From Swiss-Prot:
InterPro entries cross-referenced by the UniProt entry: DNA-bd_dom_sf, Methyl_CpG_DNA-bd, Znf_CXXC
Protein name: Methyl-CpG-binding domain protein 1
Record note on modification: Sumoylated, sumoylation may increase interaction with ATF7IP.
Binding-site residues for Zn(2+) 6, renumbered to this chain: C368, C371, C374, C390
Location of the MBD domain: 1-69
Residues the record lists as binding Zn(2+) 1: C194, C197, C200, C233
Tree of life domain: Eukaryota
SUPFAM superfamilies noted in UniProt: DNA-binding domain
Gene (UniProt): Mbd1
Signal peptide feature range: none
Residue numbers bearing the Phosphoserine modification: S409
Presence of the UniProt keyword Transferase in the record: no
Keywords carried by this UniProt record: Chromosome, DNA-binding, Isopeptide bond, Metal-binding, Nucleus, Phosphoprotein, Repeat, Transcription, Transcription regulation, Ubl conjugation, Zinc, Zinc-finger
Amino acid sequence: MAESWQDCPALGPGWKRRESFRKSGASFGRSDIYYQSPTGEKIRSKVELTRYLGPACDLTLFDFRQGTLCHPIPKTHPLAVPSKKKKKPSKPAKTKKQQVGLQRSEVRIETPQGEYKAPTATALASLSVSASASSSASASASASSHAPVCCENCGIHFSWDGVKRQRLKTLCKDCRAQRIAFNREQRMFKRVGCGDCAACLVKEDCGVCSTCRLQLPSDVASGLYCKCERRRCLRIMEKSRGCGVCRGCQTQEDCGHCCICLRSPRPGLKRQWRCLQRRCFWGKRDSSKRGSKVASQRHSQAPPLPPHPASQYTEPTELHISDIAPTSPAEFIYYCVDEDEDELQPYTNQRQNRKCGACAACLRRMDCGRCDFCCDKPKFGGGNQKRQKCRWRQCLQFAMKRLLPSAGSGSGEGAGLRPYQTHQTHQKRPASARQLQLSSPLKAPWAVVTAPPGPVRDSRKQQAGRGSVLPQPDTDFVFLQEGTSSAMQMPGTAAASTEVPVQAAQCSAPSWVVALPQVKQETADAPEEWTAVTTFLTSSTLQSGFPSKAADPDLSPVKQEPPGPEEDGEEKKDDVSETTPAEEIGGVGTPVITEIFSLGGTRLRDAEAWLPRLHKLLAVNEKEYFTELQLKEEVL
């Protein structure tokens, strides 16, 4: 058919139809049907066409692909057809009889009188064999239908009487009548109730359970509604509790010698498992259906358990269950302990929704739209990965504690919910940082790395990472990292460098550091102008709040002089600068490199004379950058 619009008189004047064929893709060659209304609207399915025309137009007989009305052809059955079906099984018997009659006449004509007895005997034998085969087939069919069956409830053998219901085939007449009466009684209890139990005497709904809260007024007015959970008859037997008809359900007392009865009961808790002799046989049959076919066949062939006489076993007094649980199977309730709450909750085989229906979170109807669970929902633009209810709608009684909002959330609904994201995996550190941490064998916060003398190599600049400081020729470096107990080794150090760990005293106050980065580097032609001096803060008379470091025994001690009055005044000013926040100093937790040079070949004579000045300069200068002029003024 051409892909042009054609008239469709079946729908009325003005309607057009078009069939377009697919020319590419996996469905090449298939066609799509389109219809165009008199107003120009394009319709491509029968559902859209029904919605467009409305309920007044019946399209049950309309063929959407052909565009025609298909009237059903009435099926006419001739009268001769049933008669032919009836005569079909009788035709082979007649033909056999005719063939046997012809054989008899031929034998009588062709054979003499003394020889025709044997063929007739063989013919009669063949007839008897065929008749016996047909009779044996019918007998086997009748025998299979009337084979003795063992009753699944009482265990007696009975003959099958042609019951069509599959669940009643394995029950005898008495057990079948009890089963039918029990089902009829249970239906009455579900509709009306017994009228005697405590639940049937309640006349008003609680208004708290999920049935009362989810019910619409129109359902209540029409009468098609579920009963309140507190008004449901107590004589209703749930499927998980048993059928109430078999021997296991009718047993009222525990045996006292099975593995369940011999368990020591916990104080304050009811037993969760039922005695093996009181378990329903129907439940065992249902569980075997879920297993393999071999297990079901074995279960059907296994004989029923013999009843245990009560006279052989004396029931011990400490295992008597009458004071722990009711004896009636209808009132026997299992309990389970929740992981978060130490309260007893009724045990059911069905999936439980964790809500009580009475707390403020359960009564809340609207999502907050700001917690992490709401942000994950598709209606708020999320990816639907967590699939959890709003944190502010999680039940306060049954929900898990990790799903509830944090305690410090305050009055704001969306505040305080980010601490739950601490369970996520940490971000991976770059490979360079991991190599630096693994390559450092030291555990002390300070480490001294001495570079061998020699000219500065250009490869060091290439090996130095971003943000690192290149070592100066013939200098010693002191690496200090606040907030950690591991030393960091900067790139570019020699393999034969000496490492001396220094043990730091445990101090809770923040440690002040001396930072002299970006010192002007001299040319490599004059290495004798640089003289390396490594200084350790060993004085116990330093300012309060600074940790003292142990000195290296290999280095020569530094002469210390008592501070003068000017230094005392400056120390008092430095005490005020200690109160400045860490952000002004340059941040906490950044590695600091201390380099001390004796410019002009002179050695440093006193550490306490210039240390307070450097502290003051470090507190004032936020960028931790010192010019060469400031360095010379402070050192000299």
